[in-house]
Swiss-Prot record:
Belongs to the herpesviridae thymidine kinase family. Its EC number is 2.7.1.21. The active site is at 60 (proton acceptor). Signal peptide: none annotated. This is Thymidine kinase. It catalyses: thymidine + ATP = dTMP + ADP + H(+). InterPro entries: Herpes_TK (IPR001889), P-loop_NTPase (IPR027417). Homodimer. GO terms for molecular function: ATP binding; thymidine kinase activity. Substrate binds at residues 78, 102, 105, 148, 198. ATP binds at residues 32-39, 192. Keywords: ATP-binding, DNA synthesis, Early protein, Kinase, Nucleotide-binding, Transferase. GO terms for biological process: DNA biosynthetic process; TMP biosynthetic process.
Length: 352
């Protein structure tokens, strides 16, 4: 975490009463498949003060997952799949345990989002506005509530029921959110995973392939919504998601980012499954409401892609080059100071 909130005495009104000093904030969520290098990129951005403005970095909540409670979530979710594959755990039981672990991944992100979202400010500014403060979050809650659960569902590790339960917990994003989905060629991605050798983490090529596809779906979903379309546009013509769809979604780079995506390129397509439809093939209203909510929660996210194939400093520069295209919000000095305190606390408590 780099420099603190811009110093300075709060301005005063004509009567001499202190007024609330305004602070322009750009917030960035670095996201993508695990092991690409986003955490290193975020730390470098904070240490170098991206774009010349003070930068606060909120890391992955690793301690929350690994040491604060009785079970290591990262080791646990991989161990569950191993036990299932070895025949030591029934498929249905494994799915329930996987859903439990996945919900624990999301808890600290939801807590952090709830704590910080009221501090961002409500007024969205013109893109390209020079920020007084840059916030870099290591993942958005969409990762643990939508993307990773969707991948687990496509792999057969979680049920649609569990996926819907997770998706429903995604918080609505206030105006001004910017998510950067990080990418990397497969060979370098695997090399970096082997180099970091995180305890309990496994290099699961099929999971990696599925996550890559799901993140392309996320990018396409944000583009789709930004174009003014809704999930009902083309729903009737969309084929029902079936075993062939799931198989395709587990193949390396079967999905790609589309500038003008169709509904079938988005996350919404995987929800057109018999489990959510009535006997006529019509989606039940309660499930339609869930997709309406997902649409509204994602609508305020501006999505970008960034290739992290360079050095850490080069990767940070790639993300920083997107700053002029990003949305910002107008907050105040007290809120900015509260964000700085939150970042310091989160860094101190979440490190392992």
């Amino acid at each position: 975490m780099a420099a603190c909130v811009p110093p300075g005495e709060a301005p005063r009104s004509a009567s001499g009463t202190p007024t609330r000093r305004q602070v322009t904030i750009v917030r960035i969520y670095l996201d993508g498949v695990y092991g690409i290098g986003k955490s290193t990129t975020g730390r470098v951005m904070a240490s170098a003060a991206s774009g010349g403005s003070p930068t606060l970095y909120f890391p992955e909540p690793m301690a929350y997952w690994r040491t604060l409670f009785e079970t290591d979530v990262i080791s646990g979710i991989y161990d569950t799949q191993n036990r299932k594959q070895q025949g030591n755990l029934a498929v249905d039981d494994a799915a329930l345990i996987t859903a439990h672990y996945q919900s624990r991944f999301t808890t600290p992100y939801l807590i952090l989002h709830d704590h910080t979202c009221t501090l961002f400010g409500g007024n969205s500014l013109q893109r390209g506005t020079q920020p007084d403060l840059t916030l870099v979050f290591d993942r958005h809650p969409v990762a643990s509530t939508v993307c990773f659960p969707a991948a687990r569902y496509l792999l057969g590790d979680m049920s649609m029921c569990a996926l819907m339960a997770m998706v429903a917990t995604l918080p609505r994003e206030p105006q001004g959110g910017n998510i950067v989905v990080t990418t990397l060629n497969v060979e370098e991605h695997i090399r970096r995973l082997r180099t970091r050798a995180r305890i309990g983490e496994q290099i699961d090529i099929t999971l990696i392939a599925t996550l890559r596809n799901v993140y392309f779906m996320l990018v396409n979903t944000c583009h789709f919504l930004r174009s003014g379309r809704v999930w009902r546009d083309g729903w009737g013509e969309l084929p029902t998601s079936c075993g062939a769809y799931k198989h395709r979604a587990t193949q390396m780079d079967a999905f790609q980012e589309r500038v003008s995506p169709e509904l079938g390129d988005t996350l919404f397509a995987l929800f057109k499954t018999q489990e959510l439809l009535d006997d006529r093939g019509v989606i039940l209203e309660v499930h339609a409401w869930a997709l309406d909510a997902l649409m509204l929660k994602l609508r305020n996210l501006n999505v970008f892609s960034a290739d992290l194939s360079g050095t850490p400093r080069q990767c940070a520069a790639v993300v920083e080059s997107l700053l002029p295209l990003m949305s910002s919000t107008l907050s105040d000095f007290d809120s900015a100071s509260a964000l700085e305190r939150a970042a310091r606390t989160f860094n101190a408590e979440m490190g392992v």
